């Protein structure tokens, strides 16, 4: 009788061990699946973020090129204006300098 009870306990222990092993295997499978899903989601988010960044970069760099061209045109116009102004007043400046240099004050 005792032998039958021991055999029954050993069988129950083996069954419990199989249940624990099955649960452990199922848990590991779920963890592996969750990790793969998380990695996929992270990769998708990274791709999406990178694409958004590239779109913004292209949009702003296009504006930057237009701004540079506009600034160059404005600078050239200002330089031309200053050259014209200098040419216009240079005779007056020379006359004023000659007058002040050649005039003696007592």
UniProtKB/Swiss-Prot annotation:
It is a peripheral membrane protein. Its main location: membrane. It comes from the Eukaryota. It is found in: Vacuole membrane. Residues 33-58 have a biased composition (Basic and acidic residues). GO terms for molecular function: proton-transporting ATPase activity, rotational mechanism. Gene3D superfamilies: 1.20.5.2950. PANTHER family: V-TYPE PROTON ATPASE SUBUNIT G2, VACUOLAR ATP SYNTHASE SUBUNIT G. Belongs to the V-ATPase G subunit family. Catalytic subunit of the peripheral V1 complex of vacuolar ATPase (V-ATPase). V-ATPase is responsible for acidifying a variety of intracellular compartments in eukaryotic cells. This is V-type proton ATPase subunit G2. It comes from Arabidopsis thaliana (Mouse-ear cress). The gene is VHA-G2.
């Amino acid at each position: 009788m005792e032998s039958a009870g021991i055999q029954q306990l050993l069988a129950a222990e083996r069954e419990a061990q199989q249940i624990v092993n099955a649960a452990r295997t199922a848990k590991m499978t779920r963890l592996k699946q969750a990790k793969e899903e998380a990695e996929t989601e992270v990769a998708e988010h990274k791709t999406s973020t990178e694409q958004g960044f590239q779109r913004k970069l292209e949009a702003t760099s296009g504006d930057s090129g237009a701004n540079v061209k506009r600034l160059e045109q404005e600078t050239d116009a200002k330089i031309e204006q200053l050259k014209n102004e200098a040419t216009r007043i240079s005779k007056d400046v020379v006359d004023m300098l000659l007058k002040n240099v050649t005039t003696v004050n007592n």
